[in-house]
Regions:
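Catalytic cores of glycan-processing enzymes that make or break glycosidic bonds
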Residues: 1-152
Length: 152
């Protein structure tokens, strides 16, 4: 159930990514794949995103793009292979996957004002620990609370 929920969440993140990038970046998916140039420290984000853009970007647009690209990165991190090797949800690896998802949702909300979490909570509820009385939705809400408390 967890993988299905995260796949649905990734779909929503990707949808917002395309909406934000449409008409502003030459090739949004190629830019996403080349984002490693920023992550590795090879390039600074403002210069890099301007290279990807089909228009001259202002500071506010650059900030939105920075958050959206970080959300895309977190959406990829949700699928780290270590999250799927263990039998129980109540381990650090699946929790990290859910935390990455929550952080991506928070970044999307910061960038666009859209809350893409509403449809995902019921999906996350279906992913339950068999050892503890917790669900992936519990982890998600905790992570969102941390984002709102410490990052807002």
């Amino acid at each position: 159930h967890l993988r299905e929920a995260l796949e649905k969440l990734q779909f929503e993140i990707d949808k917002v990514f395309v909406e934000v990038c449409s008409g502003m970046l030459r090739d949004p998916w190629q830019a996403r794949d080349r984002y490693i140039e920023v992550i590795s420290g090879e390039k600074k984000f403002p210069d890099w995103i301007q290279e990807q853009a089909s228009i001259l970007l202002n500071e506010q647009q650059i900030d939105v793009f920075k958050k959206i690209f970080m959300a895309e990165l977190d959406s990829q991190r949700m699928f780290a292979s270590c999250a799927w090797f263990f039998e129980d949800l109540n381990r650090i690896e699946p929790r990290n996957s859910v935390n990455y998802g929550a952080h991506a949702v928070w970044l999307v909300r910061q960038a666009t004002g859209k809350d893409i979490s509403t449809g995902i909570l019921s999906e996350l509820e279906r992913s339950r620990s068999w050892q503890a009385d917790v669900t992936a939705a519990d982890f998600f809400r905790q992570a969102m609370n941390r984002c709102e408390t410490y990052l807002d």
